């Protein structure tokens, strides 16, 4: 779990639940800084992930965001199943055919993810290689709603 909050109790609660927490000391550098920190942690933990040509089933990373509270476990499971059963190198939950979060990237795309800068996330890589993206259209669009500020809750 990548930790990017000013509230230490969130980190403490996540660790109490068994999450491995990685602190992002520079969230102002944008989405790419968080993605890279998380991915580098995976590579550090699983050295075989450095072999970007490793099999897609054994070398993939699932990215989720914390501000989608209505996402269902069933949707995440369906996304993983879709990725596993497809021949694609990426999979993403979609709204109206547009890829979003959560999303999965095979190791083949790690170099491009690690090269991202600023407030640019994995969507840039997905859009570049749309033919290699399996899209899971989520029927309940509320699941994919980002809740960045309190008015978003209603």
Which residue ranges define each predicted feature?
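A conserved catalytic-core signature of glycosyltransferases
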Residues: 99-100, 121
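Conserved beta-strand segments that form the floor/walls of ligand-binding pockets within enzyme
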Residues: 63, 104, 146
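Nucleotide and nucleotide-moiety/phosphate-recognizing core
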Residues: 1-66, 70-99, 129-140
């Amino acid at each position: 779990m990548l930790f990017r909050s000013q509230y230490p109790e969130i980190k403490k609660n996540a660790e109490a639940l068994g999450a491995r927490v990685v602190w992002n000391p520079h969230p102002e550098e944008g989405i790419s800084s968080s993605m890279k920190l998380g991915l580098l942690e995976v590579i550090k933990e699983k050295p075989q992930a450095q072999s970007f040509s490793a099999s897609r089933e054994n070398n993939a990373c699932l990215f989720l965001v914390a501000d989608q509270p209505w996402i269902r476990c069933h949707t995440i499971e369906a996304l993983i199943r879709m990725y596993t059963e497809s021949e694609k190198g990426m999979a993403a939950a979609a709204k109206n055919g547009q890829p979003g979060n959560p999303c999965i990237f095979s190791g083949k795309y790690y170099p491009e993810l690690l090269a991202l800068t600023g407030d640019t996330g994995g969507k840039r890589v997905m859009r570049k290689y749309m033919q290699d993206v399996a899209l899971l259209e989520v029927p309940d669009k509320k699941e994919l709603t980002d809740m960045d500020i309190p008015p978003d809750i209603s």
